[in-house]
């Protein structure tokens, strides 16, 4: 998959010339398998889980194809920033508390290819009917343990119940 032209182009845009061992392993596995990545902060996990997504997205579908749940707005914004740096051209939305709900709702009227959000804000959008997760093919739970530690268990259950089976 590292020879995939989409991934090569994305890497060229970041200035990264070589992937680390974990990133190579994730790229090799692709998105067809469930994975758990355990690695210290700053080790490149975000890039490792974003790169394989690029080869699964299609421009024909104007629906949410992947969902990333992060426990904090800071992490959600970091993931969004890394995704945008890949220069894929796919639409991405980031939803989190403290950001105007009206702005997020308006943006969600034209669904992104990738939706990133915090558990509480995603549940708000689900309950208000602002987001449809039925087309999500890939789910990434970044720092899932932290989400549970912060008490987002019920929110995670709500979100997961709205994903396709």
State each model region's role.
Residues 1-38, 142:
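Conserved pre-motif I regulatory segment
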Residues 4-9, 61-127, 135-138:
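Conserved nucleic-acid-binding Ia/Ib motif block in the N-terminal RecA-like helicase ATPase lobe
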Residues 13-17, 91-95, 147-149:
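Short, flexible loop segments at the rims of nucleotide/cofactor-binding pockets, characterized by
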Residues 23, 41-45, 119, 142-145:
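Conserved phosphate-binding and hydrolysis motifs of nucleotide-dependent enzymes
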Residues 24-35, 46-61, 74-77, 82-86, ...:
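Walker A/P-loop NTP-binding motif
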Residues 38-41, 71:
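P-loop (Walker A) phosphate-binding loop of NTP-binding proteins
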Residues 52, 107, 155-158:
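Alpha-helical transmission elements in cytosolic ATPase-linked domains
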Residues 119-165:
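SF2 helicase catalytic motif II
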């Amino acid at each position: 998959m590292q020879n995939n032209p989409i991934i090569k182009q994305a890497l060229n845009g970041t200035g990264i010339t070589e992937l680390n061992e974990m990133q190579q392993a994730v790229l090799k596995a692709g998105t067809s398998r469930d994975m758990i990545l355990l690695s210290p902060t700053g080790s490149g996990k975000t890039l490792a889980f974003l790169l394989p997504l690029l080869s699964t997205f299609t421009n024909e579908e104007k629906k949410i194809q992947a969902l990333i749940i992060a426990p904090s707005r800071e992490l959600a914004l970091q993931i969004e920033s890394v995704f945008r740096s890949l220069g894929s051209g796919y639409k991405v939305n980031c939803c989190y508390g403290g950001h105007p709900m009206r702005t997020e709702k308006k943006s969600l009227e034209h669904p992104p290819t990738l939706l990133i959000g915090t558990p509480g804000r995603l549940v708000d959008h689900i309950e208000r009917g602002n987001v449809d997760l039925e087309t999500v093919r890939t789910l990434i739970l970044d720092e899932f343990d932290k989400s549970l530690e912060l008490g987002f268990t019920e929110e995670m259950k709500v979100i997961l119940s709205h994903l396709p089976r």
